[in-house]
Amino acid sequence: MAAAKGTAIGIDLGTTYSCVGVFQHGKVEIIANDQGNRTTPSYVAFTDTERLIGDAAKNQVAMNPQNTVFDAKRLIGRKFNDPVVQSDMKLWPFQVINEGGKPKVMVSYKGEKKAFYPEEISSMVLTKMKETAEAFLGYTVTNAVITVPAYFNDSQRQATKDAGVIAGLNVLRIINEPTAAAIAYGLDKAGQGERHVLIFDLGGGTFDVSVLTIDDGIFEVKATAGDTHLGGEDFDNRLVSHFVEEFKRKHKKDISQNKRAVRRLRTACERAKRTLSSSTQANLEIDSLYEGIDFYTSITRARFEELCADLFRGTLEPVEKALRDAKMDKAKIHDIVLVGGSTRIPKVQRLLQDYFNGRDLNKSINPDEAVAYGAAVQAAILMGDKSEKVQDLLLLDVAPLSLGLETAGGVMTVLIKRNSTIPTKQTQIFTTYSDNQPGVLIQVYEGERAMTRDNNLLGRFDLTGIPPAPRGVPQIEVTFDIDANGILNVTAMDKSTGKANKITITNDKGRLSKEEIERMVLDAEKYKAEDEVQREKIAAKNALESYAFNMKSAVSDEGLQGKISESDKKKILSKCNEVLLWLEANQLAEKDEFDHKRKELEQVCNPIITKLYQGGCTGPSCGTGYTPGRAATGPTIEEVD
């Protein structure tokens, strides 16, 4: 595939589902994957023979829960001992281990134990999205804009960028999901004077509320709030707990420790939840859920709303907080935009509508696709797309948390306030605390609390070589500079000597080293090559099987009676049966073996078939009846739990 210089894609890398779009011919195309779905599960599965990504991974999760990884976004850029990681680990069927303070996912792949960083798992999902786009466009794509929740701190943003690099992408920019949704929305509503927009994004795993103003193509994020751990999965969990209790009541058995039963129940619950957005009742039918017991039951929308009542009501708190931070009254909001699949839930819409005194909600954009839509537009802008639709757009993002440094007594001195528009640069003069102090320790924090001990330390460095002087005399100029990706550079300079030191905040030790990233890039290519070998192997196997079946049906065709001698017919049938028996016994053979068997079979069949043709074949099996490599006549799909 040739690479096209001018195309960049937008990827919404979600906790549970991901989506990819491209801006071309003046409009955004959201691209369907090989299964025809416009969103792809953010799942990666490892088996004894292969690696699966997306739908294929999610579909086999009930059979292989320990080796099917999802929710990598909850791990990315976090430390192993982060309370979020520790509490999530209790809910995951896969194993998370601690390697040097960082979490890694441990799975069994091709019979060996393997540990992957969250960045690697996310990179596999990104690779899948990249390939989805390439299949649609017909050429290689490397440039991309990737979105993250507005809440992501610096190390989570860096780690997401690393995942893009491992996937072979040139990450043009990391942008906030609500900002991306606003772009999608702003494109549709250009030229209406200043508008205040509230974006309510309730996805599979995260919840974000953002307040922005859009004025003549300029977007400004005024405030963001939310809950990094609220979404569709939590509603699924409530349903699962409800049905586990119901199963206990009805059958006096506890299924909660049986991972496969719980996973099958969860799949049915997710389906029921979706059904309840359009119907008032949903039925669950799960055959042989546990110890041979069939579980047939139903749930009403009202009961579902009751089970999740506190979670649904809780979505309004971040709405109030975002409005407070933006210093905006709710009556001043022009548009309320719904993003994320969970905003389809009628109760959530009703609560939001009531809070805004019955105002209409904007549902014009497909909530699952809005973020990828905006990312695709932003990608086109960064690639210099000159079409009128995108030319007038300017994007102003914000810093999600206040940034500052520690001064005497452990006080947090803020240089960049939370919700400041980025990119931004702030400079302040500091001085020494004691006489003849030879150096200062610059400690950089993010957070909203008055004391640094309650905030998050991002990094520290020393500025040494300050000439002896009384306290308060030296002038140390400290500059905080955040670039468009939200990456922070802090510089300190002694004005008397011009001596300076700086740090790029890539969260302490939280980031992968250049070597690690390079190793992961190579690993990713290796896994991709292995996947390719596996695909070719399956294709060769299928081609052999279908050729054998086609030959069998061709020579047994009524229309060939009298055209083919019994001995020839027998010869073909016995060779076909021999090959099919060999196939059954050698499912895991190599591609060459399948190809070799097919040649063997062709050597027997071709002379006979050629003879038939020359004899002027007329039966219905003539022509296409025995084209080698036609699809196998056996079943090609399998039921999913």
Curated annotation (Swiss-Prot):
A Pfam family that the UniProt record links to this protein: HSP70
Protein keywords: ATP-binding, Chaperone, Nucleotide-binding, Stress response
Annotated region (Nucleotide-binding domain (NBD)), positions in chain: 3-388
Region annotation (Substrate-binding domain (SBD)) ranges: 396-511
GO cellular component: a single term: COP9 signalosome
Alphabetical list of InterPro entries matching this protein: ATPase_NBD (IPR043129), Heat_shock_70_CS (IPR018181), HSP70_C_sf (IPR029048), HSP70_peptide-bd_sf (IPR029047), Hsp_70_fam (IPR013126)
Residues given in the record as ATP binding sites: 14-17, 73, 204-206, 270-277, 341-344
GO molecular function terms listed in the Swiss-Prot or TrEMBL record: ATP binding; ATP hydrolysis activity; ATP-dependent protein folding chaperone; heat shock protein binding; protein folding chaperone; ubiquitin protein ligase binding; unfolded protein binding
Origin superkingdom: Eukaryota
PANTHER family in the cross-refs: HEAT SHOCK PROTEIN 70KDA
NCBIfam families per the UniProt record, alphabetical: PRK00290.1
Function field: Molecular chaperone implicated in a wide variety of cellular processes, including protection of the proteome from stress, folding and transport of newly synthesized polypeptides, activation of proteolysis of misfolded proteins and the formation and dissociation of protein complexes. Plays a pivotal role in the protein quality control system, ensuring the correct folding of proteins, the re-folding of misfolded proteins and controlling the targeting of proteins for subsequent degradation. This is achieved through cycles of ATP binding, ATP hydrolysis and ADP release, mediated by co-chaperones.
Record's comment describing the protein's domains: The N-terminal nucleotide binding domain (NBD) (also known as the ATPase domain) is responsible for binding and hydrolyzing ATP. The C-terminal substrate-binding domain (SBD) (also known as peptide-binding domain) binds to the client/substrate proteins. The two domains are allosterically coupled so that, when ATP is bound to the NBD, the SBD binds relatively weakly to clients. When ADP is bound in the NBD, a conformational change enhances the affinity of the SBD for client proteins.
Name of protein: Heat shock 70 kDa protein 1-like
